[in-house]
Swiss-Prot record:
InterPro entries: Band-7_stomatin-like (IPR043202), Band_7 (IPR001107), Band_7/SPFH_dom_sf (IPR036013), Stomatin_HflK_fam (IPR001972). Coiled coil: none annotated. SMART domains: PHB (SM00244). Belongs to the band 7/mec-2 family. One of its GO terms (cellular component) is plasma membrane. This is Putative band 7 family protein R614.
Amino acid sequence: MTDSTCPMIRNYGAIVPESQTMVKDDSELDIFSEKYREPVFASVLRSIGCFLGYACIPTNGLCGRYYPYKSISKGYRGVVQEFGRVKREINDGMHYVNPVTESISQVDMRIKVIDLDKKDVMTSDKLSIKIDSVVYYQVTNIHDALFKIDNVVQSIIELSYATLRNVIGNSTLEVCLTRRDKIAESIKSIVSEATNGWGIEIKSIQITDIVVPTDIINSLSSAIVAERQAEAKIILAQGNVKSAELMRQAADMLDSKVAMQVRSLEVIDKLATSNNSKIVFLPTDLNLSTRNNIIYSDIQSTN
């Protein structure tokens, strides 16, 4: 119902003033149990309200603010106040109120989302980034949400920003980029603990975007390229050292007399198995029996 037809019904935004966040003392909130002496004039006003309300019932709401039945939308809850004091809480539906002495404050009980604008934050490695995030919350206690905290939405925004700066300030850029969900969960835990007693529940906090400036991206890319080039040089140097070691070991093996004789025999064997005519020069360091065997095998193959 709009303000023009029912000005006594106020929405949540109208109830909570745009002021500095302030939690009220519990002693000021004991409005259900505190007893007080009602002035006689209050009874007179209540009687007048009842008369006007019942008189306006046949008009089916044409009397405007004096129509006694007010509706609460689905997903909302209301608090009925009389002379500034809470009388009862009401659910969605049609309810009778005294049009003179009573008013209804409505609160949206559905899950709501707050889109936090991008903020510049500094990581622990002194890099400035922009972070975009959203907060999902729900009112769970209408009484606390109305009377324990001024401007719930603004309070959640300021608390979320402060927590975001603190958590990101203790994390490196690499952690922010690779462990976004863990950071969001840490922020949610801190904000939930701080809002305990506000009559709300923080359902979720999500980091939707992390913007890294172009100059930081370029510098990081250069650092990564340099690091990979250094690693490649190290791998190449290690390969050269290994290759040199293997070549040295092979040279040591070939320098031995046994190795030289084996290689000579291999060459002579290849020559002996060839069909072409050949002249074989035998090394002088071979012993006589070996030379005779070679010559004999060569003659046999020729025949």
